[in-house]
A protein has these predicted regions:
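Short S/T/G/P-rich N-terminal loop/turn motif that feeds into the first structured element of a domain
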Residues: 1-63, 74, 80-86
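Short, exposed beta-strand-loop hairpins at the edges of beta-sheets
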Residues: 69-71
């Protein structure tokens, strides 16, 4: 069964620079077969979320995602939530 990752975090500095680094991260992951979305809260422009649906192998995804975040200096604390279909 596949799962969807919802990863949310706060952005407290240059939104444009962080958005560019996140776009590069998501392009790399999409090329590896894990397309994602970048969202932000409607009522808080500093709270953002990455969403990656249909992850078949969570450990393989995390083994690619976490180092890719570090390479792009996306080291802010994040909250990972994994959901699957009922």
């Amino acid at each position: 069964m596949t799962a969807t990752l919802y990863c949310y975090f706060k952005i407290e500095s240059d939104h444009d620079a962080v958005r560019g680094r996140l776009a590069a991260l998501q392009a790399e992951l999409a090329a590896a077969g894990w397309p994602g979305q970048l969202l932000r809260r409607c009522d808080d422009a500093d709270t953002w979320m990455e969403v990656y649906p249909d992850i078949a192998d969570r450990e393989a995804f995390r083994a690619a995602w976490l180092p890719a975040r570090r390479r792009r200096d996306l080291t802010m604390p994040v909250h990972e939530e994994w959901f699957q279909q009922i």
